[in-house]
Amino acid sequence: MNKKYGCLIALLLLALLVSVGLNFGQFLGKLDLDVGMDAGIATAHPKRHLRETVVETAKKPTQDKIVHIDLEGIISSMEMGGLFAEAMPSVDSIKRALEQAVADKKVKAIVLRINSPGGEVTASDIIYNAVKKAAKEKPVVVYMDSMAASGGYYVACGATKIVASETTLTASIGVIIETMNYSELFGKVGLSMTTFTSGAFKDSLSGARPMRDDEKAYVQNLVTQMYDRFLGIVSESRGVPKDQLKTVADGRVVTGREALDAKLVDQIGYVEDAYALARVLGKAADAGVVKYRHEVSLFDALGMASAKAAQQPAKVQFDLSSGLLPKLQPGVPYFLPPSYAR
């Protein structure tokens, strides 16, 4: 009897081991690893698979499709921390989605839905460039949701066409850099800071002392340079002279209707109208609409804790008491409405 139970247990253990082995093999097959050699050390990084979810079925049997991509929230190159670690799309995730859509021959056009107040200058510029690059291959229609302001509008300028809702808040064409000065507070509490620099402008944004006039002029020049690039991109994209744009390119936020009147967008409508326009531009009248989603791997589930601990990347931390707005980094240039920088 004991021998029978022993054989049964052995068989069950063997079956369990075979099952685990097969499942692990399937997992490795599904997990696309990007393997690279660095100084003789092999490193593997998981590539995120972008799976498709049907948003609108095709009107007739066809393989043609329109891809819907979302750009939501503050545009940042930094990793979101804490509760919102996966809440915001990264620059890389947007680029990957655009690249996959361009590479897929069945995709006839792209609809990029933007619901963002803007964000970092460089991150916005990178996504704008990716959108512009994609638009050279396939039509890209931007649909502006509740807000596509500042950096959000900057990104939209890379598209083939722009559709906005009547109530969309957009434009806010401008640049902002903030720093906090606490030198008087230091004096009141008896604190002081000694700084050693290699040049007169190395600590221009230090809050430990008042800024000199030449430092203010220096920082303002940086802002002006970035603003001029922003204005130039809008002018080229929309075919509107810079002088004409300056009536609305002073940092103000405008509605979708006002944006249409100022030639900042092409038409008023809803996301369904953006789909319809994409079908026309892509010459795919019966195309369905799909949305990309990330396949969560085991590495994502585990959070790649060891890698994150080793890299210690910069993060944008959220303060739940302040309306879910990120704390902006002092001295970093942003394409944001002023109200988002407070």
Tell what function each PLM region has:
Residues 155-161:
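Alpha-helix C-terminal capping segments
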Residues 154-155, 185:
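Hydrophobic/aromatic ligand-binding patch that stacks against planar heteroaromatic rings
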Residues 172:
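Extracytoplasmic ligand-binding site segments that recognize negatively charged/polar headgroups
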